[in-house]
Every structure is written in C-alpha cells, then in structure tokens.
Amino acid sequence: MKSKKKIVLAYSGGLDTSIILKWLQENYDAEVICYTADVGQEIDRKKIIKNAKRLGVKNIIIEDLKDTFVKDYVFPMIRGHAIYEGVYLLGTSIARPLIAKRQIAAAKKFGAYAVSHGSTGKGNDQVRFELGYHYFGPKVKIIAPWRIWKLNSRTDLIKYAKKNNIPIPTDKKGAPPFSIDDNLYHTSTEGKVLENPKNSAPEFLFQRTVSPEKAPNKASFVTIGFKNGDPITVNGKKLSPGNLLEKLNNVAGKNGIGRVDLVENRFIGIKSRGVYETPGGTLLMSAHRAIESITLDKETMHKKDEIMPKYAELIYNGYWYSKARFKLQKIVDLKKNKVNGSVKLKLYKGNITIMSRQTKSNAYSMKKVSFEENKTFNKSNVERFINFHKQKLRS
C-alpha cells in the first residue's frame, strides 16, 4: 500500500490552526504532522497534543527553542538596536525566521512534500514564514490556507469550527478573544476594539506589564553585565539567554516598562494597529546603548545608527536570511568584542534611568573630559579644527 504524502503544519493548538488542520485533512490526500515551536509563549503542551489527536494527528512535534531564539535571534537584533518606525522592537517579526527554519527541518525529517502556516492574507507573517521556507527548503511546497479557502471572515471560521466540533475559545465575557501573539521577547494584541484608532486600549489587554500608575512606589534597580556585545548576567548572576530575558521581563513588567500602542505600516501595504509589550527587551535596548556609549568610538556608533532603519526594515519584512541582512549584521558586530562591562538601571513607574556604566574596554577618558587642568588635550588645536570647518560652510 502506497503511503500518504505528508504536510507539516505550524500548529499552535488554537482555533485558527485547528481549523487549518481539519481543512488540510479534508482538501489534501495527505497526513498532517503538527509542529509547535516553543519560543517562550504561554504553551499548554497537553492541550496542543489533545487538540491535535482529537483531529486524528499521529505525529506531533513540540520543540523547545527558547535559548536558541534569544541567543541567535533576539541578541543579534539587540546588538543592532533594531527598532521599526521608531517604537516597534520587532517581537513578532524575529520569531518567524526560526520557526520557519525548524519547520522545514521537520518536513525533511518526515519526508513531507509541503509545509503550511496559519498566517492571514492581510498580514506580514505570511511573507516572513514563506521567505524562511524558501531559504531552507526551496523545493518544499507551501500551502497558505488563508489565501486559498473560502472562509473569509471570523464568522465563517466559527461556523466551520462548530460544524467540525473544534473547541472555540472565548474571553471572560464569552466573546471571541483578541488576536494575540507572544514569545519570550514580547506579546502583541490586535483586533476588535483596537481596529478603531480612536479607541483607547483597555487595561485588561495588558498581560506582561502593569500600568505605570499602579507600579510600585519604590524604584527597582537592576545591573546587566555584557560580554562581546551580549548580556550574560543580571545582578552579577550568570544566566542562560532564555532565563536572562525572562528575569528582565519580570522586573521590567512589574515596573510598567515596555508598553507600546502602535499604528504600523505593514510590508504588504496597509496600516494596522496593535498593542505591544516588550519589557525585558526595552531594558536590554537601553542597557546596550549605555554600554556601547563608553566602549565604542564615535564613528562605529554613528555607522550603526545610520544603518539601523534599513536593518530593522529587513527584519520586519522577513529578510532575516537575506544577504543584505547578513552584511549589515557584520557591520553591527564588527567591534562587538569591545562591548564588555555592566550597566546599572533604575526602574520606576514606566521609566528607565541609567545610573552607572562600568567597563575595562574604555573608549571614555576621564582625563580628557575633565574640567580640571590637564595636559592630555591640546586646546590650541581646537581653533584650527573650527577654522577648517568654517571653510566647509563656504565651499
């Protein structure tokens, strides 16, 4: 008997991917294998397995990628100070390349002819997933149900789920939940009342951060240690990448740090509004800039600032595995070996204050900058310097 073809589905266990699972089974003569990447989201392994088995799935993969995600994807992005459109720390964008890579690896392991994802036809994630699929498996077929099926609305999905006895999640009021994506780096919330930009985001939406008004009346202090450009310690204790970010998420979140309400320009050409929480990432961005300020020369820092918007845009658009991103990463990392030391931060009601910076790889000279008399800086050279730049104004 000839064995069935196989499809590997990026599966969360939620409504959308459960519907896609059933739809694939109905429309393709193939075995569907469920792949779940644990990148630090709230994950219920028993629920995922139960929901998949209910629909007849035999092979279910749940892969712990938390440390890999932080070390090989988040940390390089922190080194590049990647921020899209001034505020977005790219929490959703950076998870997709890793998931796509490992999903293709699963497809190759099981000899699957196709992969599938649950990204909608209006979103950026379909691009991010499929560019990753193409990079690692250019011959693997891609099935994007949202661009194929006739289930064109949330109402259609609910009807399909009821017809096939697929559990429909609801919020505390019994209504369909918001669209939520989370990983160890961030949580994003979209849809429903947020679709109208005149509506304020309800406080109950926030999952990782307290309101700054309700944050403790006493400040918290945290010291982050860096080696070769990456954070390695919190308050002197060495931690794995995943545990380090988790610890920073906790301390920043309880102090109301890391909230963003953003209307962004999607790659596909439409605007969308979302509420993002990136508590630990916000701390790391501040601390990394602070440690670079005393370890790197001006030209290197300015070059990084110059390329950052393009670097961030490449990540946002799904080009993590592109030659352009690889080249920019080399520039970002050119002097990362000098970025060593520690930064102490004060956290208070949504605000971050840099308290101190310490390093042995010092580009900062106390003698040169001192207001006291010293012989290390020749002030007479300054007049020639100014005259030279006066000439540039006339040319």
Curated annotation (Swiss-Prot):
It catalyses: L-citrulline + L-aspartate + ATP = 2-(N(omega)-L-arginino)succinate + AMP + diphosphate + H(+). Its EC number is 6.3.4.5. Pathway: Amino-acid biosynthesis; L-arginine biosynthesis; L-arginine from L-ornithine and carbamoyl phosphate: step 2/3. L-aspartate binds at residues 120, 124-125. ATP binds at residues 10-18, 37, 118. Homotetramer. Belongs to the argininosuccinate synthase family. Type 1 subfamily. This is Argininosuccinate synthase. It comes from Pelagibacter ubique (strain HTCC1062). The lineage of its organism: Bacteria, Pseudomonadati, Pseudomonadota, Alphaproteobacteria, Candidatus Pelagibacterales.
